[in-house]
């Protein structure tokens, strides 16, 4: 019974997990591993979920903590090949400004800190500020201030 509830939950909210994986990992194989690790961590914590927060807030918290801790363990260094590939991907977009803008936005978001990435991802998902505050562990006012700074940072990165 518990397992059926969990599987249903994952099926219903797998998009949330995929978005966290995409935001924190470029390599598709590592992204799949991260997805599996997040599901595993959710399963380990599922029996202790008491419903004090919304289920999506709980899922975001575990997914982000898993992605961020995995990131810290591997301490990735951006390779010049990755930057060249990104540049080629952008220049090969045949003048499709929308596609280029999306790629530039993804690139800019990847330049943010782990917490900033988590916050902007939730904001793009239209998660209310009170839920972002609860997930990240800061006040709602602090979320507003940080979101303004993050938006400015992204604008600046996209201009350069």
Regions found by a protein language model. Give the residues of each.
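Arg/Lys-rich amphipathic alpha helix in sigma70-family domain 2
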Residues: 48-50, 61-81, 98, 149
């Amino acid at each position: 019974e518990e397992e059926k509830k969990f599987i249903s939950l994952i099926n219903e909210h797998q998009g949330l997990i995929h978005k966290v994986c995409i935001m924190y990992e470029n390599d598709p194989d590592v992204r799949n591993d991260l997805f599996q690790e997040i599901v595993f961590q959710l399963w380990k914590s599922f029996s202790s979920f008491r419903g004090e927060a919304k289920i999506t807030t709980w899922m975001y918290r575990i997914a982000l903590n898993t992605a961020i801790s995995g990131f810290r363990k591997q301490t990735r260094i951006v390779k010049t090949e990755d930057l060249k590939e990104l540049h080629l991907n952008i220049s090969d977009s045949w003048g499709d400004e929308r596609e280029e803008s999306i790629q530039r936005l993804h690139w800019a978001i990847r330049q943010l800190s782990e917490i900033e990435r988590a916050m902007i991802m939730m904001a793009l998902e239209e998660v209310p500020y009170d839920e972002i505050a609860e997930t990240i562990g800061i006040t709602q006012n602090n979320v507003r201030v940080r979101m303004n700074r993050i938006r400015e940072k992204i604008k600046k990165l996209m201009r350069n």
